Structures are given as structure tokens and as C-alpha cells.
């Protein structure tokens, strides 16, 4: 990273230390935010393509080569539509709610490491920051349901808040277990900790990642992430056959699109977190020269893409759960299981067979 040191020294000489710090932080935010927004846009394209292939259809194939410009067509369509605010709605909160849903999903990327040194803010409490910032998103859903002054929207918001809080608990127990085996809240340290051990010393890095010893927690995390993002088969929040579009029923135009941007941004974020917590983050699966030449951010992207594709596969394969079934799964199965596994791992770490030393 010699060129970064040269750029930093030249920037400080030109603008001064304080001004350069502000400018450099803004540049890093743009470098992270723009690709994330593009990934969100093209995730909608990949979802339609993948479901189309699973249903033996073509999917989007008209706008641009193989339909690659379809996300831009969708954006232009939504930009030209009017944002209709209901006459009885709380207008300020009605407009603020979609923004509150999207912003935490983007702000959480500040501590996500794309490589050993490629991170916007390498803070020691990175995992705690992600858990805290992502929990704010539920407020946008609640505010949208209340501000719309609609029965359908309010019912959807009530469902959403209960479901998201329930599965946040399961995810929190999973992340606490990862914290226990890693011994650090720093995201970089969590990734580096998965590169140590008997298998890693012999080049089989993928067998030293947390997915193998914590496999039940990995499965619970992925399913809970699907429920946390209100994705099918846990999308009773916006169950079309029951409450139309849930908390989004009164929204249109770009305000409506912001909710979907937030949903897909959360999908990518939780998939990236799964890659960092369980799949070795930016590390290559096998410690050999050709694979080690590939930049870490590409490995992180490949693993994140794999987990995101699981979200889409679930949508195309499983029927929607009833609301009572979703809550029973979260409170009576996942939360007790994660709590028990946390105790099991804690005991395991005190035995001579501790593999995380």
C-alpha cells in the first residue's frame, strides 16, 4: 500500500492534516457506497434471472445486452412516478421512514473489512457497531406503518417489528458465539482468527473457517437473516394475499423504491457478515499461489454472492410460512438452540480439544 502512503502525504501537504482527513474520509465513503448501490441494483437483476432459470424462463432480456440495463430502466421508471402522500398521513414521517430504512444498511459498511487493510473504520468494536446500527432499520418500518394512517400498513408494521426483533435475538446469540471463539469484536481479528489452526497450517484454509465447527449456528444465521430482511418464505410482513404490501402499501415512486433498496442492501450486508463470521472473509479457500494472487475483496464478493444466492433460492423453492409458525420457529427453536450452542462452545473451549487456540 505504498501508493496510499504517498497519496496521504501529498494530500496533507496540499490541504493540511484536518482538511485532508475530511476529504479522504469522504472519498473512502464514496468508494464503498457507490459499488454497494450498484450491487443492490444488479441484485434485483440477478434475482429475476436466477428465478427465471429455476422456473425454466428467460428472465429480463430486453433492455440492453441480455437485459443488463434492466436495473437502470427500473430506476428511471420509478423516478418518473409521482410520490403520492395520503391526505391523512403524517407527511414528514411518511417521507423520512424510507430513508431511515435504507441508511443503516449503508452505514454498517463502515466497519466491513474488504482486506487486511481495506476498511473504512478499523474499530475494535466493529461487530457491536454492526449489531447496533442494523437494529435501527426496524424503526423505519414502524414509522412507515404508523405515518401512513392505514390499517394495512399498520398491521404490516406490527408484524415487521415483532418478526425483526425476534430474529435479531437469534442472530445476536450467533454473533456472541463467534465473538467467544474469536476473542475480539474487531472484524479484522475475526477473519484473521479463521486463518489459524491445524488445517490452515497445511494449506486447507477453508477447513479452519468457523462454518465447520459452528455449522448449526451458520445454518441458523442464514435462516434468521432471511427472516430479518422479511424475505420469502418469511415475507408475511408484505403478504400480498393478506395485507397487500404491508407497511409499503401507501408508498409509490422513489419512496417505494427506497424500501426495496433497504431490503436488498440488508441482504448484501448480512451475506457479507456471514462471509466474515463463518467463511473466512477475504481469505482464499486454499493457501496456494494462484488463489493467493486474487485480491481479498474479490474473495469476499464471491462468498457474499453465494450467500445472497441462497436467499433467492429460498424464495423460488419454499412456500410462505404462517405468522405463528415464523414466531414459533424464532422463539421456541432458534433462540433456545443458539443459547445451548453458546454454552456448548464455551465448555468446548475449556477442554483439551479446543481448536481455537
UniProtKB/Swiss-Prot annotation:
Keyword terms, alphabetized: Cell inner membrane, Cell membrane, Membrane, NAD, Quinone, Translocase, Transmembrane, Transmembrane helix, Ubiquinone
A cellular component annotation (GO) from this entry: plasma membrane
Biological processes, Gene Ontology terms: aerobic respiration
Catalyzed chemical reaction(s): a quinone + NADH + 5 H(+)(in) = a quinol + NAD(+) + 4 H(+)(out)
Membrane topology category: Multi-pass membrane protein
Record field: transmembrane: 20-40, 92-112, 127-147, 165-185, 206-226, 268-288, 294-314, 329-349
Location within or outside the cell: Cell inner membrane
Entry's EC annotation: 7.1.1.-
GO MF annotation terms: NADH dehydrogenase activity; oxidoreductase activity, acting on NAD(P)H, quinone or similar compound as acceptor; quinone binding
Function in brief: NDH-1 shuttles electrons from NADH, via FMN and iron-sulfur (Fe-S) centers, to quinones in the respiratory chain. The immediate electron acceptor for the enzyme in this species is believed to be ubiquinone. Couples the redox reaction to proton translocation (for every two electrons transferred, four hydrogen ions are translocated across the cytoplasmic membrane), and thus conserves the redox energy in a proton gradient. This subunit may bind ubiquinone.
Family: Belongs to the complex I subunit 1 family.
The protein's assembly and partners: NDH-1 is composed of 14 different subunits. Subunits NuoA, H, J, K, L, M, N constitute the membrane sector of the complex.
Name of the protein in question: NADH-quinone oxidoreductase subunit H
Organism, scientific name: Bordetella avium (strain 197N)
Gene encoding the protein: nuoH
